[in-house]
From Swiss-Prot:
It comes from Afipia carboxidovorans (strain ATCC 49405 / DSM 1227 / KCTC 32145 / OM5). The gene is proS. CDD domains: ProRS_anticodon_short, ProRS_core_prok. It catalyses: tRNA(Pro) + L-proline + ATP = L-prolyl-tRNA(Pro) + AMP + diphosphate. This is Proline--tRNA ligase. One of its GO terms (biological process) is prolyl-tRNA aminoacylation. Its main location: cytoplasm. One of its GO terms (molecular function) is proline-tRNA ligase activity. Catalyzes the attachment of proline to tRNA(Pro) in a two-step reaction: proline is first activated by ATP to form Pro-AMP and then transferred to the acceptor end of tRNA(Pro).
Length: 441
């Protein structure tokens, strides 16, 4: 993509309403625009990151055996009355009515609707286990939306829902999602720690929040620092095998949110030098809630003994849009964002340091065409901005690799590659630069 043809509304000044780094940088980098309190338009650069994150989430859900569908944003109020949550959910739920006075709501979550879909089609244990997921926009009418996408009113979520014959089988489904979440966040360059958590309005008696440690987080957390060094399962993980050893490794060390923190146990189990008491950002949460919804909504299947019984369920959420902010909170410096390569809007930025000069124009054009032809996401800064301005823009928007092309280097047959993550620089030939990114001239 040529920057002269791209829509990238960079802000020179930091908006006054931005309180934390991710909000400031997303606004300054032209990633989003606030349209109302807690409601944002995703501009092209931000939308590219959102789609990269969504792709990783989808790949790991599919790998774990979940099946994608898509449910509507609007739901019937009567479904929520069946479960008993319509009145209990509170003012965060946006309640609306259509022209026929039918009561609807803008879904903050989807347990009722997925249970209604399940009970309409699945009648036998032979169709279990089943895990269905979707990625959809949601709305919660937060009393005080703040911190940009970290606590917005409209947000993109991945929700998965598992259905099993009994608790033992449901725990296996829970374990699969536990491992899938470890892999999902690791692929995005995040260290997300699973921590025991409260179940809240979802219900049930088992839940883990996946927390990225950050001083700007809204959750108080307590853990053994050894949990920060645990290995994440690799691509070869077999979801049909016994995942208990992995789960045990991650859950036997103390890690809990402040809502369920046990101070006595913490002091007993965790040596003083290994205690971590900080704040964190919740990027995902998983729940096992048994028959909470299948009981009230009559989601029954016939078991092997011929007797009908309510299914056991769990739900598994990932805050897709919140992850954009969480990654920035974990990956930035005073100059801007430092995107992990897997979620970066572009992999490479080509900076023409003397736009209009025939030699630099030709070299940039050749590299740009070769890289894009080989499937590399490239942003080519072909503007007439001064070099200092180009450096500032590239650092602000956080492209992982910058290729700097100027007349002095070209005279020696060299271009310069800068790594945004650590600031390191290296001179090499244009051909070697192409090879660095798996491309050929």
């Amino acid at each position: 993509m040529r920057l002269t043809r791209y829509f990238l509304p960079i802000l020179k000044e930091t908006p006054k309403e931005a309180e934390i780094a991710s909000h400031r940088l997303m606004l300054r980098a032209g990633m989003l625009r606030q349209e109302a309190a807690g409601i944002y338009a995703w501009l092209p650069l931000g939308f590219r990151v959102l789609k990269k994150i969504e792709r990783i989430v989808r790949e790991e859900q599919n790998r774990a055996g979940a099946i994608e569908l898509l449910m509507p944003t609007l739901q019937l109020a009567d479904l929520w009355r069946e479960s008993g949550r319509y009145d209990a959910y509170g003012p965060e739920m946006l309640r609306i009515a259509d022209r026929h006075k039918r009561e609807l709501l803008y879904g903050p979550t989807n347990e009722e609707m997925i249970t209604e879909i399940f009970r309409s089609y699945v009648k036998s244990y032979r169709n279990l286990p089943l895990n269905l997921y979707h990625i959809q926009w949601k709305f919660r009418d937060e009393q005080r939306p703040r911190f940009g996408v970290m606590r917005g009113r409209e947000f993109l979520m991945k929700d998965a829902y598992s259905f099993d014959l009994d608790e033992a089988a449901a725990r296996l489904s829970y374990n699969k999602m536990f491992v899938a979440y470890l892999r999902t966040f690791a692929r995005m360059g995040l260290k997300a720690i699973p921590m025991r958590a409260e179940t809240g309005p979802i219900g049930g008696d088992l839940s883990h929040e996946f927390i990225v440690l950050a001083e700007t987080g809204e959750s108080g957390v307590f853990c053994n620092k050894d949990v920060l060094d645990l290995p994440v399962p690799g691509e070869d993980v077999d979801y049909d095998s016994d995942l208990t050893p992995i789960i045990k490794q991650w859950t036997e060390l103390y890690a809990a949110t402040e809502d369920v923190h046990d101070a006595a146990r913490y002091e007993t189990e965790v040596p003083a030098e290994k205690r971590v008491n900080t704040r964190g950002i919740e990027v995902g949460q998983i729940f096992y809630f048994g028959t909470k919804y299948s009981d009230s909504m009559k989601a029954l299947v016939v078991g092997p003994d011929g007797v009908e019984k309510p299914v056991h369920s769990g739900s598994y959420g990932v805050g897709v849009s919140r992850l954009v902010g969480a990654i920035i909170e974990a990956c930035h410096d005073e100059n801007g964002i430092k995107w992990p390569e897997a979620v970066a809007p572009f992999t490479v930025a080509i900076l023409n340091l003397k736009q209009g000069a025939s030699d630099t124009d030709a070299a940039c054009e050749k590299l740009y065409r070769a890289l894009t032809a080989n499937g590399v996401d490239v942003l080519y800064d072909d503007t007439d901005q001064r070099p200092g301005g180009k450096f500032a823009t590239a650092d602000l928007i956080g492209i992982p690799w910058q290729i700097l092309i100027g007349p002095k280097g070209l005279a020696e047959g060299k271009v310069e590659i800068k790594c945004r993550a650590d600031g390191s620089r290296e001179l090499m030939s244009p051909e070697d630069a192409l090879a660095r990114f798996g491309a050929k001239a």
